[in-house]
Amino acid sequence: DGANSAIRKQFNMPITFKDYDHHAIVATVKTSDEHNNTARQVFLPTGPLAFLPLPDKHTHSIVWSTSPEHCETLLALDDSNFNKAVMAALDGQCGLCEVQSERMAFPLKMRYAQQWVSGKVVLMGDAAHTIHPLAGLGMNLGLKDAAYLIELLSNEQGEFASARALRDYERTRKLDAQKHIAMMQGLKELFAGA
């Protein structure tokens, strides 16, 4: 149920979090050049800008991670000037850009649930962990959570076996999430020059 999980709160599953001091601007953008099903990411002094291909060959979902101040500036631009800012950031790699949706922004935070299993309640994906979108790994981590849990439960039978599988899920997936959180922090600091 997402990063602000109501289930996690209802079952008193505490989290550790860290503010990345970055905001993400998300929008849908149409470009004059085809994306050829290729994702692009540019590393700017203020943070990365990712272009993720959508089914229409000219349409992308963008995620622009930047400082809170720069985020405010970008959101205040009219569509024409925002389009120019996106094109300049990409150095014209995708041709002309035209924003197709409302621009939305949210603060980026690392979240890590200290407990992922409570009885038969299991956290996974953004309810269990969020990381900086720098390398686009957040969704992949959530899919790995689901795949691992399905694999474990499909091999188990009985109440005791299921409890053992859930403990294994929590231990294994927490370790993988911790590795990715540390890696993203290192990459963020590397690209930020921190």
What would you call each of these model-derived segments?
Residues 70-161:
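FAD/FMN-dependent oxidoreductases across multiple families
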Residues 6, 24, 85, 145-152, ...:
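Generic recognition of well-ordered alpha-helical segments
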